[in-house]
Amino acid sequence: MAATREPATGAGPAPRGRRLQRALVSLEALVSVSGLGGGAYLMARPTTAMPMRLLDGTGFASWRLPGVALFVLVGVAPGVVAVAATRGLRAARVGHLLVGAGLVAWIVVEMLWVVVTWPLQIAYASIGVAILVLGLVDRRAG
């Protein structure tokens, strides 16, 4: 199935719509860069990136697989949605919602599993909520 673009109206999106898209793309780009960096770091240093004791009882022998998950789910996915949004693809509207909800879910699981730093986790949960809310506004506007 081919991706569809937003219909051309001649004047482009209204200023409010452009600001909304810029906000979504900026937040998703921030999340993507940090997910790619964090995931790459965990994969490159699977036994030293974080204390191994945090993996006790999880079934993980190292931080490699959590790093892969972080890289793909928190790094690649938001990046793909941000690129889709900049290209005007309609799929980005659903993507924003998935990224926002996914980031909130990721942080909730992370907070239950391994609390490293509350301020950072609260910040990323807030970013996830912001992406979700802005994504809902974008979807209703479209």
Which residues are covered by each model-predicted region?
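Topology signature of small-to-medium multi-pass alpha-helical membrane proteins
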Residues: 2-142
